[in-house]
């Protein structure tokens, strides 16, 4: 029987982590106390809230909890603390590269405007990277619940700061709302500015939303993408083009996309040759971080250490990390497997 190696020592890249959702529960409680914010009971119970976002009511509840947590981030020091702690958690889980996703419009009103908010976030990322040794970059994400013109503004802003650590442009929130093609111009602006396109798709809706991300937004990565498993032709397309899917198993179960961890189609994607980068999504709400996603692959899908190492390689290759960083992480993965 193969020896089960420590998954926290497996070098990996983390490509799907939302900004507010990365917060430690203890930090949320401290910030809520600092600002006198009364949090919903679901955020103070000491265990992950029970969520099911497969209908609009469930998604509204999820969003309400997220907004409550975000309301506790009010000052630059709060931003710096969140980013530093996210980096510390990732390092603890074996990550050597983190691309954290943020919609700065959510923080701009309290941080002096959009540009100050972006600069505070980027400065926090630089500081956290220096302090922890973790390679870190930022994806700016538009909100599909807002007007496409807002997304274009964000895309231009993201391109403006591409030399300061912004590497990609995303599209998040309830994929059942709006059409991907409404945001095609924003993604064109981002791509023309050298940013990778990483919209959400194939989570709450089926394979069609993944196709829309490919056809309308020319995605180079897909946030989630698991529902592509329902369409063999789409799987082949993803595999042929080596489009990385940022798969978040614990999140998929918590939000009701799948009933059990073993129902998440990790094997289907893996055996079809679709690259995956396992991600934690929103640890604050789902109760698990990066290494736990690899543990799900091991425990519920019988991934061997050789296969887990390949998953880690796929996460690195799908990242925006520079070549030298990728080479170092890939060598570390080989050492984890053979050492």
From Swiss-Prot:
Keyword set, alphabetical order: Hydrolase, Metal-binding, Nucleotide metabolism, Zinc
Listed EC numbers: 3.5.4.-
GO MF annotation: an example: deaminase activity
Disulfide bonds: none
Xref: SUPFAM superfamilies: Metallo-dependent hydrolases
Co-factor: note: Binds 1 zinc ion per subunit.
CDD domains: ADA
A Pfam family this chain is assigned to: A_deaminase
InterPro entries (alphabetical): A/AMP_deam_AS, A_deaminase_dom, Ado/ade_deaminase, Metal_Hydrolase
Known cofactor(s): Zn(2+)
Binding site for Zn(2+): 16, 18, 200, 281
Binding residue positions for substrate: 18, 282
GO biological process: nucleotide metabolic process; purine ribonucleoside monophosphate biosynthetic process
Gene3D superfamilies, A to Z: Metal-dependent hydrolases (3.20.20.140)
Record: active site: 203 (proton donor)
Superkingdom assignment: Bacteria
Root EC class: hydrolase
Keyword presence, Zinc: yes
Site (described: Important for catalytic activity): 224
Similarity-based family: Belongs to the metallo-dependent hydrolases superfamily. Adenosine and AMP deaminases family.
Stated role: Putative nucleoside deaminase. May catalyze the hydrolytic deamination of adenosine or some similar substrate and play a role in purine metabolism.
NCBIfam families, alphabetized: aden_deam, PRK09358.1-5
Protein name in the entry: Putative adenosine/adenine deaminase
Species this protein is from: Streptomyces virginiae (Streptomyces cinnamonensis)
Species classification: Bacteria, Bacillati, Actinomycetota, Actinomycetes, Kitasatosporales
